[in-house]
Amino acid sequence: MPTVLRSIFALSLLAVFAIAAAFALPFVSAKTLEIYFIDVEGGQATLIVTPTGHSLLIDTGWRGFEGRDAERIVQAAKAAKIKQLDYVLITHYHRDHVGGVPQLADRMKVGTFIDHGPNMEDARVVKEDYTDYVKILQRVPILHMVAKPGDTIPLKGVTVQVLTAAGEHLQSPLAGGGQPNTFCATSPKREDDPSENARSLGILLTYEHFRFLDLGDLTWNKELELMCPANPIGTVSVYLTSHHGLDQSGSPALVDAIHPRVAIMNNGARKGGSPSAWQIVKESPGLEDMWQLHYAMEGGKEHNVPDSFIANVDEHCEGKYIQLTAKSDGSFTVYNARNKFTKAYKPQ
């Protein structure tokens, strides 16, 4: 090869390697955690896709409605470019959380179901939904895991720690937790809740400097048991409001102590978003914004966030979702699928 051609060839190779190097580093650092808050009309279906492409769905929405909620989950999975659900975590056995399991299992492959163990509630509808859920667990090759406080769910790319399950709670503080909780004094105990809500399987998800808390429908007294006298969690980046923002949950002992930067309320138009619970979240120390899946009819303008932060502003909605994208440095963005409004939150 002539000298001139060899020089051109060498320079070309250097240029190729330089371009590859320029794209390689951003590609590695640009991996993100994606969380889709799917509208299931006052139930829960939260799809998590880790930076390694692995998935966890928390709850499956309602049964019936011609498979409405299962279809919305499938569409979110398509948007996230995943073809199966590695894990499906059932927080508890109420219809708005476990009801959609059979319809979802007919539409998507599920690797492992996670729950808190057997149902202990006597209500007929709860027993029916639990029976239908168990039938799905018996399908081969679906796997099943019963989680207990202190367990870690083996979801690749993030750390998922179990805080509450089957009425029990974490006994030792996590990293960043353990401080005395002064907000316990403003959260008097209430009448005990014997329902499945109090048995909710709650988790803390950590992606390096980003932390996301989801306690399902955990109710007031169980929040106090978890959070008092010391806060075992520390602070979080994002808090999914407990129990859809109903006033049976969301004590200051929890909400104020975890000091969320952003709260996301998975309420329906006429389910959740109780004015008193909404106010506790809105006034929590350090809160920058609250986002809602629905405009809460009960709250009126005084107890709803601005429309830009609400995915569905009409009672008869189209199932618009909220999407969160988090980076390892703790920064994240939140996106409203209805109006494409996006807000970025810098690392702290």
What are these regions (language model features)?
Residues 2, 7, 22-348:
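Non-globular, low-confidence helical/coil segments that flank catalytic cores
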Residues 10-24:
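Bacterial N-terminal signal peptides
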